[in-house]
Design a protein with these regions (language model features):
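S-adenosyl-L-methionine-dependent methyltransferase catalytic core, i.e., the SAM/SAH-binding region
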Residues: 1-159
Length: 159
């Protein structure tokens, strides 16, 4: 919800010939832009801004999509694919991909039976994502956002 305000603040600073030159300056600008009452305890207000920049620069979602597409064409029967995601955009992509692999039918829902002929590649083994327990989070703070999903291929793919 703050992207437009942050972008406007960056533009104003740029127009004043004073754009942020360091990550600390950018973090301070973001912190000033987001009202204090919206600062979450334990998280710097600029955390999501840096995350968004990293995701965009590294093309993380496109790369994950490419990887999943490639893997779906090269798996052996009985093989399992485990994916750990670290933010909701990645997790949503993995969840939707696994669902499409396990329920590929594209027939209209009002048809009494499937006529498209698409067969499932396998099944999702994790109904809900596995998350780190409290002990793991205490020992490894980064694990707090990790989500594990597993898919088992029921047939050889790529044929």
């Amino acid at each position: 919800p703050w992207a437009a305000k942050i972008a406007k603040a960056l533009t104003l600073e740029k127009n004043k010939n004073n754009p942020p030159k360091t990550t600390i300056q950018l973090a301070e600008l973001v912190s000033r832009t987001i009202p204090r009452r919206f600062h979450k305890n334990g998280f710097h207000p600029a955390t999501r801004t840096f995350q968004a920049l990293r995701i965009a620069v590294n093309r993380e979602l496109q790369e994950l999509e490419l990887l999943l597409s490639s893997l779906s064409k090269n798996m052996l029967k009985g093989s399992r694919l485990a994916v750990i995601s670290f933010h909701s955009l990645e997790d949503r992509l993995v969840k939707q991909t696994f669902r499409n692999w396990s329920q590929p039918c594209q027939c209209p829902p009002d048809l009494p039976y499937c006529i498209c002929g698409l067969k499932p590649l396998g099944k999702v083994l994790t109904k809900r994502p596995c998350i780190a327990g409290q002990d793991e989070i205490e020992n490894n703070l980064r694990s707090r956002s990790a989500r594990l999903r597993v898919f088992e291929f029921a047939r050889k793919t790529g044929d």
